[in-house]
Design a protein with these regions (language model features):
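A short glycine-rich, Lys/Arg-flanked "PGG" loop and its adjoining helix->strand segment in the class I
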Residues: 63-78
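A short beta-strand submotif of the Rossmann-like class I SAM-dependent methyltransferase core
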Residues: 52-55
Length: 205
């Protein structure tokens, strides 16, 4: 899509660096990358489409967020959202004890939304289409990541030494292994019918 103008927004400095490196490598010149906290992010540009990939799970005020995104869109613009979700439960990842390791180490302040949660926030944008994808897809993805991690253990340990320090490198290797194992079991549970992936297309009211 060489005639498109693409603006990417992430709160990760490393992610911005990686995207720009890939763009340079592939001679892609129509991508701009902004590092920002979405809670504070504002932009004057208007867009035909906004795509959100696994951001809403890290936000809490969906009413305010969807209102903000509606201001980014042209009158005929649309918003596509990709999130993990539970079939009917919404619950936060909060560090309230020793057992809350996933909240503490990976998803502090995050939330597992229910599949229908976003349907309650249609003040500024309205639902056009909804899709529910089986959790078995992410089950397979988690297992593939685990296998790649195990195959590249020696290389990853060296990276973790730089990131977490010599003493904590192997601890973090095991934490990531447990994370992938947990995700594999979670999303594969009950043939992928409880935890899965939800897609939504919103348009302006």
């Amino acid at each position: 899509y060489t005639n498109s103008q693409i603006t990417a927004v992430s709160n990760s400095i490393d992610q911005r660096k990686y995207i720009l490196e890939r763009c340079t490598k592939n001679n892609i010149k129509n991508v701009k990358v902004i590092t920002a906290d979405m809670n504070d992010f504002e932009i004057q540009d208007k867009f035909d489409n906004v795509i959100s990939i696994e951001m809403f799970e890290h936000m809490r005020n969906y009413k305010k967020l969807l209102s903000k995104i509606s201001n980014f869109l042209n009158e005929k613009g649309s918003l596509f959202i990709h999130i993990f979700s539970h079939e009917f439960l919404t619950y936060p990842f909060e560090n309230e004890g020793d057992g809350d390791w996933m909240a503490r180490e990976f998803f502090s302040g995050g939330m597992m939304p229910s599949h229908n949660l976003l349907l309650y926030f249609q003040d500024d944008l309205k639902i056009d289409q909804v899709w529910r994808l089986s959790g078995t897809h992410y089950e397979k993805t988690s297992l593939a990541w685990l296998n790649e991690m195990d195959k590249n253990k020696r290389y990853i340990i060296e990276i973790f030494k730089e990131t977490y320090g010599e003493k904590n490198a192997r601890i973090w290797f095991q934490r990531w292994r447990i994370f992938y194992l947990s995700c594999e079991q979670l999303f594969g549970y009950n043939n992928g019918t409880e935890w899965g992936v939800s897609h939504y297309r919103f348009v302006k009211n």
